[in-house]
Amino acid sequence: MVTPDTAILIVQATPWSASTAGPVTAEVVSVTIQNEKDLDQYKGKLGGKIVLYGPMREVPPIDKGLFGRYTEKELDDIAQFPISPNAGVSPETQARINAYRERQKIIDKVAAFFAEENVAAVIEPSRDARNGGGSGGTLFDDNGATLGRTPYIAEKRVRVPVVVAAIESYGRLFRLIQAHVPVTVQLDVETRVTGEHEHGFDTIAEIPGTDPTLKDQVVMVGGHLDSWIAGTGATDNGAGTVVAMHA
């Protein structure tokens, strides 16, 4: 942030984002786009600006650890818990899922609109998580942060620089805009797409059991390993896969 005060913002380019032509300094504006008709009010007003796209996230207090190990009793309780179609989905989580689905219906048109308006860049908020898991500088920068549903396809590639910001950084910008305080930010986004297609691989393994009474039974366990630019290694489901293998 350059004005009204100088500050370092925690941001990172989203997958398949375009690059800026070196450092870009521009005025920051926010938009509220719920449907395609909302685009009309911004025509001719966004050129050369850095656009905040997305709601401000709440930063809840964190009063306990984000991770913990289940006790034997808790594991027994989970094993006996009746499984329902909505198991584990809280009303808050379902509301976020519904909002995300609605946003995805117009996301390609929004991306094309920003490109046509020649915006300098787009800043999106990192998605939040339960119990403050998306705060403290944590960035969720995977396919869910991408401005578009299929930007990995060449003709659908994002044509403007897009970054995802930590919710604290995004919230500061958002509140200043709401208070009608002019904000200027400098961004320098440098990205590179390594090829039109990267291969994925499947790994299949058989682990024989040791209980002769169960020798005719087969247990299938599956998982996926994704590497995303915001982290190192199998940041998506790596831990879950190891737990499944251990079990």
Where are these regions (language model features)?
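Protein/peptide-recognition domains central to ubiquitin and immune signaling
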Residues: 1-15, 101, 111, 119-150, ...
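Soluble metallo-hydrolase cores and metallopeptidase-like ectodomains found primarily
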Residues: 16-40, 147-233
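Extracytoplasmic/secreted cell-surface and envelope-processing proteins
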Residues: 38-39, 59-64, 130-139, 229-231
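Surface-exposed loop and adjacent secondary-structure segments within mature catalytic domains
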Residues: 65-80, 124-166, 178, 196-198
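Active-site alpha-helical elements of protease catalytic centers
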Residues: 234-247
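Noncatalytic luminal/extracellular "stalk/propeptide" segments of secretory-pathway proteins
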Residues: 1-88, 148
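Loop/turn elements at helix/coil->beta-strand transitions in domains of secreted/extracellular proteins
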Residues: 46-51, 117-121, 183, 215-219
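Second-shell loop/turn segments in exported
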Residues: 15, 26-32, 41, 63-82, ...
